[in-house]
Amino acid sequence: MKVALSIPHTEKIEKFMFAKKVIRQKENGEFQPIHRAGLLNLADYEIVEQYNAEARGLCNYYNLACDYHTLDYFCYLMEYSCLKTIANKHKTSIRKIIRQYKDGKTWSVPYETKTGTKRVRPVKIADCKRGEASDIIYQRKKFSWKTTIRQRLNARVCELCGCKEADLI
């Protein structure tokens, strides 16, 4: 007698995606990715990080399932919902966003660090299986500020006392 762990698509995965407003169901029963209005005020790389964190969480949770490869469709829906969110933010099409952020065969969003420019790309199911998609780099806290940390540091104003042009760390 064999015991197999399978992924509960309808009970858990679809409920998760409807709760997060990642997809909607068409009249013919197919799923269509939609943009998430709650993420429009974030920077592009933060939007990708948010989607990656959610996708990695589910992929890691169901990592031992025998039908793990079926999560590929889930990752596809998450990626295109992410693209639709970024496209909606910039009031453009998905095709233009992919062209703008093209990086080889896939797309990735650049962001600045102290050591230079890095890129964040959407997570794929193969990354989760190999363990490459761990949360080591992207440990950001969730804030609802309209400005990014880069904009606040470039303003050269101390957020604590309000003095200007001081050497800020």
Where in this protein do the model-derived segments appear?
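Non-catalytic terminal/accessory segments
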Residues: M1-I169
